[in-house]
């Protein structure tokens, strides 16, 4: 099953404009820098790739945190870009990283509490925002975007590191079944949070201070990033590209096993596809990923990595990949693997500098703990 991509928008560590971000990808830029969100000197990972521009002022800031505000912004922009309006046949499919009780909210509220709960309100609970529970509803951004845009059709909210792929796959199925005529898909996530950095360090997933690219001989972990992206899918009409997507899970506590990637890649990838890799920068995983993908695409398929430029962006990954790969294929250019110095041996051909391409299709892969994976395939009309 595939659907026509007709509108798109994003907020990324490389910028907010489509052309701006694609130009920076082709220039081989990396957004990684010392954490600009908060003082991270006491964390194992001090680097981050963050969105520079703040969300626009919004009355919804009472109910939405920063990333949720970006999500509502890009949803509206993608609808305008596609030239479509809300209605009963417009569905909304949201993917986000999952519920997180943020430490900056909870620590002031609980650091002076007693074991018996005596005086809990005076000891800190009064410091919680009165809308704290409402701010942590899983479908907050979905509900507000649906109200703002008049999207009254079928839809769903998905959670987890591969929620963007889940949302894309769900939207494409809804279009194929005739449940909606237009599907707005939004993915948003930030790995640049104190609680997330602690978890990534415990898993050994995030880089410390020595920055090396994925698929590099010196790779030793990824840079945490963040993004919000939205695209509009339709069953017919003038398409920028056609999109397919799948998600999967294998129950692993850490990164998914190669067998899961084999199933996903075997289901929708084709010989001759260009490849945008997961970019986890974990040598054993990177090597296994390349072998599994090359079995389908061929050993000489070009390998780029948008996440090397932007950092790992969790639930937003597949949506960002779909937008970026569509733009790159239309330009007939593929970006270099940002930051790559010495490519590790293996199948697939890491792209060292921006190059012209005649490829008309590409796949984008994503993976994260616990055992979650996604794939998106983009094909020009």
Regions found by a protein language model. Give the residues of each.
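Conserved beta-ketoacyl condensing-enzyme motif
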Residues: 4-5, 26-149, 154, 191, ...
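Condensing-enzyme catalytic core mediating Claisen C-C bond formation in acyl metabolism
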Residues: 2-11, 18-35, 40, 206-277, ...
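Residues that line or immediately flank small-molecule/substrate-binding pockets and catalytic motifs
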Residues: 187, 279, 366
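Structural signature of cysteine-dependent C-C bond-forming condensing enzymes
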Residues: 81-95, 108-130, 147-154, 177-184, ...
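Internal metal/ion-chelating core segments
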Residues: 151-152, 157-226, 231-233
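Active-site pocket-shaping loop/turn-to-helix segments
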Residues: 10, 57-76, 98, 133-134, ...
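Short, glycine/charged-enriched secondary-structure capping and boundary segments
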Residues: 18-21, 106-109, 197-201, 288-292, ...
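Short, mixed-charge aromatic SLiMs
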Residues: 99, 190-196, 248-256, 340-358
């Amino acid at each position: 099953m595939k659907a026509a991509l007709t509108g798109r928008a994003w907020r990324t560590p490389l910028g907010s404009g489509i052309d701006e971000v694609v130009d920076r990808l082709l220039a081989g830029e990396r957004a990684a820098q010392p954490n600009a969100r908060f003082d991270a000197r006491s964390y194992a990972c001090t680097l981050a790739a963050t969105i520079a521009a703040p969300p626009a002022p919004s009355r919804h800031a009472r109910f939405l945190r920063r990333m949720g505000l970006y999500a509502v912004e890009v949803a509206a922009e993608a609808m305008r870009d596609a030239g479509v309006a809300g209605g009963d046949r417009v569905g909304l499919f949201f993917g986000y990283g999952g519920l997180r009780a943020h430490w900056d909210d909870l620590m002031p509220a609980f650091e002076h509490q007693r074991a018996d709960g005596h005086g809990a309100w005076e000891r800190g609970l009064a410091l919680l925002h009165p809308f704290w529970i409402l701010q942590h509803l899983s479908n907050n951004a979905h509900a507000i975007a649906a109200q703002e845009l008049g999207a009254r059709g079928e839809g769903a909210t998905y959670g987890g590191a591969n929620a963007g792929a889940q949302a894309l796959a769900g939207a494409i199925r809804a279009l194929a079944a005739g449940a909606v005529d237009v599907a707005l898909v939004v993915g948003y996530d930030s790995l640049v949070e104190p609680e997330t950095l602690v978890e990534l360090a415990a898993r050994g997933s995030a880089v410390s201070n020595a920055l090396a690219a994925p698929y590099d001989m010196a790779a030793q972990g990824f840079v945490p990033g963040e993004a919000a992206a939205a695209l509009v899918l339709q069953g017919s009409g003038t398409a920028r590209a056609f999109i397919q997507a799948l998600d999967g899970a294998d129950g692993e506590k850490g990164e998914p096993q190669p067998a899961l990637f084999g199933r996903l890649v075997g289901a929708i990838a084709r010989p001759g596809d260009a490849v945008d890799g997961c970019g986890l920068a974990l040598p054993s995983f990177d090597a296994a990923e390349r072998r599994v993908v090359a079995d389908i695409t061929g050993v000489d398929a070009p390998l780029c990595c948008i996440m090397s430029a932007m950092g790992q962006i969790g639930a937003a990954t597949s949506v960002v990949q779909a937008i970026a790969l569509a733009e790159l294929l239309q330009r007939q250019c593929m970006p270099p693997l940002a930051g790559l110095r010495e490519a590790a041996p293996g199948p697939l051909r890491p792209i060292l500098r921006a190059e012209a391409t005649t490829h008309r299709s590409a796949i984008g892969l994503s993976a994260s703990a616990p055992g979650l994976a996604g794939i998106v395939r983009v094909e020009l009309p």
